[in-house]
């Protein structure tokens, strides 16, 4: 079907006839610029006086112009060396906000019996706090290495691997579906960047939120204006 703007800023690329929220058992969110309003790595870089440099790499990665996401993240994290944990806490307290409709959508999903997964190419410093704030069931993201309260410019390997990139997001979605005993077609995946496309491609419903052009085009549904909870206009 041709993309159809069913109301201003809400576009359906693939027909989703009469879907109900209760048809699904899991919703997976990207964090940066999807569930929250910022790219955390860019804001941490601001404390090091390197925001422009880091943000340029982030933008290229999210547009899908960088083929090696892991290497791009390593480059950005290396530029954070010397930033204090206190500066990261300040980013969390003063700059990070949930995007409009985030809390309402998460609560509606929980009320309908869905489990909630947060998968991020960002960092546990932030995903753990968002998890606790919203009562999220599962998370996967990257650990920043610190020494004496300062970032070393490196990340810590975890039991599942080294970096949560697009492929790891896809694997985590599938793993979580396996744990729940459900099909990936019973999952919703929401994101904004190229590294969200692998998990969005596995889900029964893929939703782009204020996304890069390539992601808007490939998602089944695109929310281009308004809050995350606009999904509830389609999936009641």
UniProtKB/Swiss-Prot annotation:
One GO CC term on file: cytoplasm
Residues reported to bind Mg(2+): 30, 32, 192
Enzyme Commission number: 3.1.3.3
Pathway(s) annotated for this protein in UniProt: Amino-acid biosynthesis; L-serine biosynthesis; L-serine from 3-phospho-D-glycerate: step 3/3
Cofactors that this protein relies on: Mg(2+)
GO biological process, one term: L-serine biosynthetic process
GO molecular function: L-phosphoserine phosphatase activity; magnesium ion binding
Top EC class, one word: hydrolase
Name of one Pfam family that matches: HAD
Active site, UniProt feature: 30 (nucleophile), 32 (proton donor)
InterPro entries for the chain: HAD-like_SerB (IPR050582), HAD-like_sf (IPR036412), HAD_sf (IPR023214), PSP (IPR004469)
Keyword set, alphabetical order: Amino-acid biosynthesis, Hydrolase, Magnesium, Metal-binding, Serine biosynthesis
Entry binding sites for substrate: 39, 76, 120-121, 169, 195
Gene3D superfamilies in the record: HAD superfamily/HAD-like (3.40.50.1000)
Domain of life according to the entry: Bacteria
Reaction catalysed by this enzyme: O-phospho-L-serine + H2O = L-serine + phosphate; O-phospho-D-serine + H2O = D-serine + phosphate
Family statement: Belongs to the HAD-like hydrolase superfamily. SerB family.
PANTHER family: PHOSPHOSERINE PHOSPHATASE
Protein name, as recorded: Phosphoserine phosphatase
Originating organism: Polaromonas sp. (strain JS666 / ATCC BAA-500)
Gene: serB
